[in-house]
Every structure is written in C-alpha cells, then in structure tokens.
Amino acid sequence: MSKILVIGAGAWGTALANVLAKKKNKVYVWARNSIIVSEINNKSSNKKYFKDLQLSKKLKAITGKIDTKEFDFIFYVLPASQFENFSQSYLANQKIKDFIICSKGLSESGKLLSEIATKSLNITKIFILSGPSFAKEVITGMPTALSLASNNQKPLQTSALFKDTNIRIYYSNNIKTLEVLGVVKNIYAIGAGILDAMKLGENARASFITRCASEMQFMLKQSNLNDQKILSLAGIGDLVLTCSSTKSRNFSFGKKFIFMQSAKNLSKNKTTIEGLNSIMTIKKVLNLNLKDLPILTSIINVIKGKSVKNEVNNLLRRKFKYE
C-alpha cells in the first residue's frame, strides 16, 4: 500500500486524488484553505469545485507543514506560477522520493518546473503527468489517457497507481518535451478562444489548431527536443481539447478577452490562466525566433493591445508556403 500526497485541492488536484483514493492507497490532498480541508475530511466533498459529487471516504485532507518522508509519491497540482514560492516554503531541505508534476505552465521566474525542482529540491525521481484531462470528466469516471514522462526508465511504480482506474497511462522518456508542450498549448488556447469569440467559423478553428500544432512541432525542433511528440497525448491531444471547449480556462479567457479593456483587467479574477502567465516569457525560455512562429506572434501582439482583426488579416496575407 502506497502513501500518496496530492498538493492542491483545486479541481484537478481533487479529481486526481479521488481517483487514486479508490485503490488500496492512503491518499491525502493538501490545501491552504482550512474550510476545504474540513469539508473533505468531514463531508467527503469539495463543493467549491464539484457541487453535487461525493468524494471517496478514503480521501483525507491536510494543511500546514508537509513532512515529505511520510509519502512514497507526491503530486504537485497547484498552479505552476506558485511553484517556486511553495517549494521553498514547504519542500526545501527535505528528501522526496517520487515527485510528479501535474501543472502546465512556467514558474514565477519564467522557468520550467522540472528545472527548478532538479536544482533546488532533493528529489529521487521526477515525472511529468500531462495530456487532455478536464477534471470534471476524470472525477466522474470518464475514460482519460495521459502521458507520464521520466528521464530515466519506464515509470512502472508510478503508473501502477492508475491501474484499473479510468485513467490509462502512456509512457514518455522526455520530461522537458512534455513540459514545453503543456506550456505552449495554453497560449494557443487563448488564441482559439479569441477566434471563437469573433465567430470566424469551424474552418478557421480547424486551420488554426492545425497550424498551431505545426508551430509547436517547430518549437520542439528549434529547442533540440523530440518534435515527434507533437503527435502524443500531451501534444495534439491536449491542444485539440484545450482549443475547443469553454471548460478550458485559457480558451474561456480568450473568448472574454476581446470584450475587456486589457488582459490586466481580466486577469484580476481568481482563476489561474497559465497561458497568460507564460505568454510573455516563453520566447526567452525556449530562445525562440518569433519570425518563424506567426500565430504565436499574433497572440502576443493581441494581448499587448493590437487589433485582433489586423492580426487575423496579417496571418491570411502572409506569403504562401509548403506545409
């Protein structure tokens, strides 16, 4: 029997913890909010995120100090933009066995989470869990497939946690590739939401997603990463899902964006928009040449205040090229 800690009692953290708790594991979910902790422990519910759903009675919640040596597996599911502050406050100077990063985005200082974890934390093994996964569908038992990446060997022990659940795991051997895909697809999802709000049609949506996938593949190649992973669950799978549904926070942000005066005003809400947090720093992180990434460039321009219609026209008027 494994002892598991899921850090973060938001929608995704709660869903993940609930799936893991249905097996013969001792599962704890960590939350800052003492009200949520009490509700999970006393009522087996988290109505802030799942109003009409009962959680597994085996799932327990904790808050405050974390003693990492108590746990065989630790899943990080708080926003990526809180990772450095959280890890320094709660995880530093402790030994961690298996650490699974489930957040898609860049840290406060604009870095990949695995890079920070490797340098600043005492971790035996680091993994990335990524792919198309809306929390509501996962927690209600709908089939979901995810990529689990490790730089060392097949993550057999970690993947075994999901055996006989509604989550099917596929192995990947490149952590950074999966992380980059997770960061970038959130940015493109903002663009997809903007297009949807402009009612440009299904043809435009299909073309947009296809060309975004092409740009993502180019980024991987430019960064000396495995560009074939664009065909993975963490690549095209997550991109299609995130660019097609209002369940996606980044897509919804894009839909609302053109009706607001600025990204600053819209981002005042309490929902984490990882794509917005990453959009201004991704170029530096991957050392990108934006000349070869016209869609990404246009999304950045729109967020900075340029006309959406002008950016769409600029994309359509570009010189024809081979696919």
Residue ranges and their predicted role:
Residues 6, 29, 99-101, 128, ...:
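Structural beta-sheet core signal
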Residues 55-57, 61-143, 158-160:
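Rossmann-like NAD(P)(H) cofactor-binding subdomain of soluble oxidoreductases
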